[in-house]
Design a protein with these regions (language model features):
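Midchain, well-structured core segments that form catalytic/ion-binding scaffolds
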Residues: 127-130, 136-149, 183-306, 310, ...
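Active-site-adjacent substrate-binding region
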Residues: 247-264, 271-273, 320, 330-378
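Short glycine/serine- and small hydrophobic-enriched flexible loop segments
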Residues: 159-166, 251-258, 409-412
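Zn-dependent metallopeptidase/amidohydrolase metal-coordination segment
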Residues: 280-282, 356-409, 414
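Flexible, glycine/charged-enriched surface loops at secondary-structure junctions
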Residues: 26-28, 56, 170-175, 258-273, ...
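N-terminal capping segment at the start of a domain
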Residues: 7-35, 140, 329, 389-390
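Active-site metal-coordination/substrate-binding segment of hydrolases
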Residues: 75-175, 180, 200
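A non-catalytic alpha/beta surface segment that caps or lines the substrate-entry region
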Residues: 29-78, 82-84, 88, 99
């Protein structure tokens, strides 16, 4: 399929959207949205959808943007298809005041900006994929913030598809449900989407990485909070009496497999990730996330956390280590494997646009994981972006356009 966009609508949209701060806030995870700034982009998108003919486009009280596009002639009886992306960006890197610009990349280090007189650069040694991007125009931040391609590239691509359909309603497509969710980055993106009102039989999230990625397997995920209760005694009188909670944490952490940390794992290998720890002599708290694609191995990891706590308590002769485990999401492969046609059609759409599909396990979760278990099978498609969650994040302009082409081919195959 040839690129039908000479002055890319998708690029114009993307450059506007990334300048609207939408960082979610994990500290406010008990409310949706976790940050009111997500309404800023939500309201813009709803208005643009209405201008493109989606008369029912609206923003819910929880900052979900929902809209429906009628089917093309002859496809009225086909099942409705959902396209979903998320509004929020991560808070692990600066995300306000994004200043996007386009770098014509000719090879070597990709320099996106300068901070304190020093270049912010990504080398081909750290990112070999850069070797395939020489000659491309790349959208980057100025190096002081993330870019926001995760997931505003997906948002822009879906919106650009809607614009194409508005311009030419004869483009084949079933009835489409469009949804932009809040708080995906903190694990709450799909929780409050009303699936019945959304009205789709299948859906795709557009939230992946480099163009061609096609994902229908994700981690099983849980969060473990481990608390350590110490006993503070003057160090000079501490023998046989002091229990240092900080040292208890160190002992506990040493019982978890060293090689099962994120920095030593890839592919289908799961991990324990220490996200944060605070410690005094009296009290320490550690927060881990636990991940594995395999359900049995995932449970083994959780069991080991409990066993490590029990071992320390037995050594101490009293309960000073407690564990609280919160399940987060499950591997959507349990559901999506029963819908192989969703994978086959996505592969066909990529190939029709000259893109080689790359079926990969997600080393993370997506809104599609929650949605799949709620009855809406939902694989994940690429956006074209690289280096998410950091100041080196970028996306090729050609990938933004090509991914919009892929979505056009995809919806045509459901018509």
């Amino acid at each position: 399929m040839e690129n039908t966009t000479t002055n890319p609508d998708v690029l114009e949209r993307f450059l506007r959207y990334v300048q609207i701060n939408t960082q979610s806030e994990d500290a406010n995870c008990d409310q949706v949205p976790s940050s009111t700034v997500q309404f800023d982009l939500a309201n813009v998108l709803a208005e643009e959808l209405r201008e493109l003919g989606a008369e029912d486009a609206h923003v819910t009280e929880h900052a979900y943007v929902c809209a429906h596009i009628p089917a093309s002639a002859g496809a009225e009886d086909k099942p409705a298809l959902g396209l979903i992306a998320h509004l929020d960006t991560t808070e692990v890197a600066p995300g306000a005041g994004v200043k996007p610009h386009i770098v014509h990349y000719e090879g070597g280090d990709l320099v996106c900006g300068t901070v304190d007189g020093k270049p912010v650069a990504m080398s081909t040694a750290k990112l070999p994929a850069l070797n395939d991007l020489a000659g491309e125009d790349l959208v980057c931040s100025d190096g002081t913030t993330l870019l926001g391609a995760d997931d505003k590239a997906g948002v822009a691509e879906i919106m650009s598809l809607v614009a194409r359909i508005a311009q030419d309603p004869s483009l084949p497509h079933p009835a489409l449900g469009i949804c932009f969710c809040p708080d995906e980055e903190i694990g709450h993106g799909a929780e409050l989407l009303d699936i019945d009102t959304f009205g789709c039989k299948y859906a795709y999230t557009v939230d992946g990485g480099p163009i061609g990625e096609l994902e229908w397997e994700c981690f099983n995920a849980a969060e473990a909070t481990v608390c350590f209760e110490g006993q503070s005694i003057h160090p000079g009188d501490a023998k046989g009496r002091m229990v240092n909670a900080g040292n208890l944490f160190c002992d506990f952490n040493a019982l978890l497999p060293y090689v099962q940390r994120p920095e030593y794992t890839e592919g289908y290998e799961g991990f324990y990730h220490l996200e944060g720890v605070s410690a005094t002599v009296d009290h320490a708290t550690a927060r881990y996330i636990v991940r594995d694609h395999d359900a049995a191995k995932f449970q083994q990891k959780l069991d080991l956390i409990d066993a490590a706590a029990s071992m320390l308590n037995q050594r101490l002769g009293e309960e000073r280590v407690t564990v609280e485990i919160k399940q987060q999401y499950r591997n959507m492969a349990e559901i999506v494997r029963d819908y192989p046609e969703l994978i086959d059609v996505a592969k066909e759409a990529y190939l029709a646009c000259g893109v080689e599909p790359q079926v990969l396990p997600i080393r993370d979760g997506t809104d599609g994981a929650q949605l799949s278990f709620r009855g809406l099978p939902c694989p994940n498609l690429s956006t074209g972006g690289y280096c998410y969650h950091g100041v080196n994040e970028f996306v090729p302009v050609s990938s933004l356009v090509k991914m919009t082409d892929v979505l056009q081919e995809l919806v045509a195959r459901f018509a």
